[in-house]
Amino acid sequence: MLVLGIESSCDETGVALYDTDAGLRAHALYSQIAMHRDYGGVVPELASRDHIRRVIPLLEDVLAEAGVGRADIDAIAYTKGPGLAGALLVGASVANALGFALGKPLVGVHHLEGHLLSPLLEADRPAFPFLALLVSGGHTQLMRVDAVGQYTLLGETLDDAAGEAFDKTAKLLGLGYPGGPAVSRLAEFGNPGAFELPRPMLHSGNFDFSFAGLKTAVLTQVRKLNLDGGEACEQPRADLARAFVDAIVDVLVAKTLRAAREHGLKRIVVAGGVGANRQLRERLNAEGGKRGLRVYYPDLQFCTDNGAMIAFAGAMRLQADPGQVQSGYGYGVTPRWDLEDIRIRQA
């Protein structure tokens, strides 16, 4: 089964072809980072308009790379939510128009399910069940994954997501957009222990997160030391960035390992943009290894939003339950959507 995947939930336009027999056949991605940089963040209207410009050329690129025609597509998967409503509608419109014109079935994919299953694209893929840590700009969640469509939420952020905290801290430190990679790069030059920042909810007794207070603690230090200007501030800024990253990583690692232990899970999947962070990967690998745990990640190119994960997730859902096919053609999207709402009933 050859599945076309279309991703347009935020500021990346992704298109891919996944073959259930041959694996990933082709994928193409266009990032809008340069366009949004001048605004310091994603402008929804601009994002939607750019998706319109990019999606069809990307579709033609992946068809050419795979050496197939539109008629060879067996099914079409698209990101139905969550995300920016206007951006989602672009991908949904293209998918539904193609499906109608070609007479192909469609499946609306949950964006987070795409991230969660993306490590299964790798040759060294985890078996079910596993614990998933989803860390991105909009979400920070711990999920128990028993099968495709079998997800149990164990904990989530009560305020800022980890990626959001990275972006806001980047602004406080006078760094560019996107903030997450900028903070991580600066932290590489920081001295550990130069600043002491809180580890919110580290000992809360549950698996929820909170990062708003950490951002406020960074703001307090920035104002106290006037770290937002001048070359003389470079080392203190790097030290503060290091303290921030250390605090985030400490909380994510501690809660992830405790969740794995309490739920008897030996495999951990880390997905989402923050999952590309070097410190997080190194700490989880080291601490997990001491406890006999295996940690799996998607390839770095698939940590951020992409069409490959949507094509793959759509294919997996159709294989798990052919009844997942969308009834008719339409343009409905779900900007706010809980992952547990897409549960596949077991026979």
Swiss-Prot record:
Function: Required for the formation of a threonylcarbamoyl group on adenosine at position 37 (t(6)A37) in tRNAs that read codons beginning with adenine. Is involved in the transfer of the threonylcarbamoyl moiety of threonylcarbamoyl-AMP (TC-AMP) to the N6 group of A37, together with TsaE and TsaB. TsaD likely plays a direct catalytic role in this reaction.
Top enzyme class: transferase
Gene Ontology terms: biological process: tRNA threonylcarbamoyladenosine modification
Cofactor: Fe(2+)
Source domain of life: Bacteria
InterPro entries in alphabetical order: ATPase_NBD (IPR043129), Gcp-like_dom (IPR000905), KAE1/TsaD (IPR017861), TsaD (IPR022450)
Protein name: tRNA N6-adenosine threonylcarbamoyltransferase
Residues reported in the UniProt entry to bind Fe cation: 111, 115, 305
Keywords: Acyltransferase, Cytoplasm, Iron, Metal-binding, Transferase, tRNA processing
Free-text remark on how the cofactor is bound: Binds 1 Fe(2+) ion per subunit.
Cell location: Cytoplasm
Family matches, as HAMAP family: TsaD (MF_01445)
